[in-house]
A protein has these predicted regions:
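Hydrophobic packing residues within well-ordered alpha-helices of enzyme cores
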Residues: 25, 50-54, 164, 168, ...
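A generic "binding-loop/recognition-motif" signal
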Residues: 46, 70, 111-112, 184, ...
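Short, structured coil segments at secondary-structure junctions
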Residues: 62, 70, 171-174, 228-229, ...
């Protein structure tokens, strides 16, 4: 297999549980880049939440690609946008009003700033720190919002997340979907946005056969990417549905599962 792209989910895949990239994983991926393989960071985070990792992996030097918002925005490492898909403002406001009745903390962003109704809300500080972004507290989000976001992020008690997800799913129109991206996160996107479509679009833009790609992931929203890639690899810590959707599994995110798999496949 002529591997030309390695697509990487971030949290629970590329980073360990302390949100760090190990030296072994870092060295392995830079070695792959030096062999001409392009890296794709595939995350639900805003692009700015990927910049630190981009720099650690020297991706701008090697032509890497950033897939942010679960595939809703794709850019090169210099910030040039290939495409962006956002939610409509009217529908977003309607959803925000519906969410006021549910036990969730709502976070929206414009790529530069997070906006919430309560800075002390569940996981708000965590999300700001994780993405190295500031947070602005506004009144009522539905009344205040003046732009069309790419997604709506919801922090939810893990004990209630499946029930809340089902309530939201039943409310959303056909062209929107809600997915779990962590034990405590739900995210609402346009249905046509997913990491698998994003990977296919990147390969089309770069004129690379998607069969010459490898993807790593651990969560429900990684499944389309794992299925689209030539080889989809689930981390040991992945959810069972993710493992079933993948071609193979590797060690966990705390055990350098990425370099382990790349060496097993003779990529590096």
């Amino acid at each position: 297999m002529d591997v030309q792209i390695i697509a990487l989910d971030i949290d629970g895949t590329l980073t360990d549980d302390q949100k760090n990239i190990s030296n072994l994983t870092l060295e392995a991926l830079i070695e792959a880049e030096k062999k001409g393989i392009r890296l794709v960071l595939a995350s639900t985070r805003p692009a700015s939440g990927l910049f630190s990792i981009r720099d650690q992996l020297k991706m701008e030097q090697f032509g890497g690609i950033l897939m942010s918002y679960n595939g809703g925005r794709i850019t090169d490492c210099a910030g040039n946008t290939f495409y962006e898909i956002s939610m409509g403002l009217t529908m977003t406001r309607r959803i925000l009003r519906f969410l006021e009745e549910l036990p969730v903390t709502v976070i929206v962003d414009d790529g530069k700033m997070f906006y919430v109704t309560d800075k002390n809300g569940y996981k708000v500080e965590y999300e700001c720190r994780n993405n190295q972004m500031q947070c602005t507290e506004v009144g009522n989000l539905a009344d205040w919002l003046t732009f069309s976001p790419i997604k709506i992020l919801l922090a939810v008690d893990p004990m209630k997340i499946y029930e809340v997800q089902e309530q939201i799913r039943n409310f959303l129109p056909e062209d929107l979907t809600v997915v779990r991206t962590a034990a405590f996160y739900l995210e609402i996107f346009p249905r046509r946005i997913n990491k698998g479509q994003g990977l296919c679009d990147i390969c089309r833009i770069l004129k690379i056969d998607v069969r010459n790609s490898i993807a790593f992931g651990d969560s429900e929203n990684d499944i389309p990417m794992l299925k689209a890639a030539g080889i989809g690899i689930a981390m040991k810590n992945a959810e069972m549905d993710v493992k079933k959707a993948s071609d193979m599994s590797t060690l966990s995110n705390n055990e350098d599962g990425i370099p382990y798999a790349l060496r097993a496949l003779n990529v590096i």
